[in-house]
Amino acid sequence: MNPIEIQRPDFFTFRLIRSLKSLLLPAMLLGTAAVLPAPGANANPSTAESMVIAPNLESFTLENGLQVVVIPDRRAPVVTHMIWYKVGSADEPEGQSGVAHFLEHLMFKGTKDNPDGVFSKMIAERGGQENAFTSADYTAYFQRVAKEHLPLMMALEADRMENLVLSDEVVTPERKVVLEERRQRVDSEPGSRLREALNAITFVNHPYGSPVIGWQSEIEALNKEAAIAFYDRFYTPNNAVVVIAGDITVEDVRKLADETYGKIARRAEPGERLRPKEPPLSGERRIAVSDPRVRQESISQTWVVPSQSTGEGRIPEALDILAYVLGQGPSSRLYKSLVLDQEVAISAGAYYQSGALDDGRFGFYASPRPGHTLEEMEELIALELQKLLSGGVTEEEIDRAKNSMIASAIYAQDSQSGLARLFGSALTTGLTIEDVQTWPSQVRAVTIDDVLDVARTYLKGMPVVGELRIETPTEPAAALSDDQQLKDKS
């Protein structure tokens, strides 16, 4: 319950292309159903110019400002019901890092009509699945149930949107749960500690530099008043998006939405999501985490770049293709050079974190084989980047990237829950339904010049570097003999 989506390369386009393949697996967070042929899906990438993602999607807005998105899918008598709030850790008041995630925990503590535990019990008794997650830009809750239980799911979510009951008796022990979660998932994991430190030195001025789970000292200070204030400001219908995918009709959903969410009044106007901008990187920023528990050393390099939301024109799609050419898949330049040809690395790749409300990140990573070093990895990554900057990319590389990306998007439509998550995350990070639906045609329009332009514009400066190292225990100095000690004193 309540996994945190700590910032990592797994946002909008990157998720759409690569990670949505994993959304087809039952083990995925959203617990998707078995894969069935998607209605109207065409797996031929050559049709991408006219391809529209979820063409039967419809959307409407209630009088209280709640946006509702409906994605009919009649292949199985089940529905995925998700509610997305346009608030995440980057929207937290100063000094209250972790309150967004803390409130996510507290949302399961009940209302007057549905006390602590009743919500989850009702879902379990009906054979359903539920979960929730917090990121820097949004907080989401979902249930997956047989379609006849959708009215109950909407009633339960609407109830806790308006009637959450909190007390010190509930808040205090849950704060201890979150602190223990931090100890287990961050403090005890060298890789998580490095990611947290790397975020902090990448975003010094922007709140993306604070961890989603929060800093320990600030979690310890969170209380009932902080949670209620956050809830009252942001958990209001005009700051939320409901996405329902499955065996339903738009007419039925509209009626249910009016009867449940439609009765909730606006509690607040959250206001425009204005955040401090990150100044251009100057000088070198480098962090290393050494720990005896590290099993495999690795190095990462990161640049702050435009996201799908902040990038103009074809910049986001060009960055995505650049990441694919350089480091995604066995035919990518980094993998082929470092892993296959030179056999100096166990893994090597690139990513583009595009699905953020503000700027995203572009990065490289590599893990050396035994007998090779992180310094060697860094030099070889720089060499491959320089080759691309000076020699360009080929039409074949661009086409291969486009075909793979679009094919993944086509097959991803087989996942009911995956589509619900895709549109929910997009609509809470500054994008529109049209942005998502027409993404394949935007990818097809990218040119070689577009890819080279973004490479030369955004990867020309020094990256932020993170190193994960195996800590070698320092052997204690050998004890001096009595004769040696006497000799040293003379």
Locations of regions flagged by a protein language model:
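N-terminal secretory signal peptides that target proteins for export/translocation
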Residues: M1-R18
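Bacterial N-terminal signal peptides
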Residues: R15, S19-V35
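Non-catalytic beta-strand/loop surface segments
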Residues: G40-S89, N114-H149, R185-N238, K263-S309, ...
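Short pre-active-site segment immediately N-terminal to the catalytic Zn-binding motif
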Residues: G88-Q96
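Solvent-exposed, non-transmembrane alpha-helical starts
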Residues: E94, P151-M154, K255, T310-I315, ...
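Active-site SXXK
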Residues: S97-T111
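Short, polar/flexible loop-turn hinges at active-site or ligand-entry regions and domain interfaces
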Residues: K109-N114, M161-V170, V393-T394
